[in-house]
Structures are given as C-alpha cells and as structure tokens.
Amino acid sequence: MSSDKPKAAKAAADLPEDFPRGTQLLFNPLYNRGTGFSAAEREAFGLWGLLPPRVLSMEHHAARILENFYKKPTDLERYVYMIGLEDRNETLFYRILIDNLDTMMPIIYTPTVGQACQQYGHIFRRPRGLFISARDKGRIADLLKNWPNDDIRVIVVTDGERILGLGDQGANGMGIPVGKLSL
C-alpha cells in the first residue's frame, strides 16, 4: 500500500484544482468508485473515514451488484436498480453492462424501457437528459448552457410520441434516449 501512496499523491496533484474531493467525489457518478478507492487514493482525495476501510476490487463490486440484480422480482425493478447504479458509479455500471450485455440489454433498453417510460413519473430518481418544451421558444440557447458538461459527443432526441408503439409519452419518453445512450 505504501508504494501506491506517491503515485496517488502525484495523480491527485496533477488533477485540476476543481476536481471533486471528499463527499463531492463520492457523489459524482463519473469518478466515484466507492470502496474501490485504494488507501492512498482515499488519503489523497480526502476520503479517509468516509468509506468502510476495506478496499474491494471492481470484480467484487460487480459480483455483488449482479447478486442483488438477480434478486429483483421484476424487470422494472432491475431497471430501477441498474439506473440507480449508473447514478452512483458509471464505471461499474458500464463494466457490468459490457460484461453481461445479453442479460442487461433487455433491461436497460427494450422491452423494459417501454414499461419504464410508462412508469417514469413513479420511478423518477434524478434528472437525465435535457427537457425542451414549446415554452422554451426563444431561450433554447440559454437552456443548452445549463447542461453540466462541455464535452458533448452524441445527442439523442425524441419528441416523446409513438414510444415503442405505446403512444405519446411526452416527457416520460426520456427513457428512450437515455437507454439508447447507455448502450
């Protein structure tokens, strides 16, 4: 562990000054690794005491997630569980998605995403995507500035109509572009 300390300290020093640390890092799904942070990383990023002391591998995390995934009684509950994981730890989410694509594809996208769209108001956890309505006419440029990332490589758009043959889902159709981007 002590040999990791200089590397982690250097890596932390090379990061931008505004890089999240402490609880901000743990609540950032792009960078959070939960108990996967090494002891040296915990020291460098101000995580000491914020996590259980044992460091667990990505494989251990993935096995635990899959164990809980299979305990969910319905595909919609599996969908909500996986989206919750994506909200906490994107690296682990995509690792599980890639390693278990045949199992995850029908959960993250069709057919389960259709049911997720129909239940969107009941399973909504946090905003995903950018909602633009007719009321935003004339202010779309300002609205686009609210997106938190500058590095945008792909955009998926829907008007919420005819979602998977389910009819007009309106804002509840956001599950379709989010699901497409996940895959």
Task: Tell me what each language-model feature is.
Residues 3-183:
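Metallocofactor- and cofactor-centric catalytic cores in central/energy metabolism, strongly enriched
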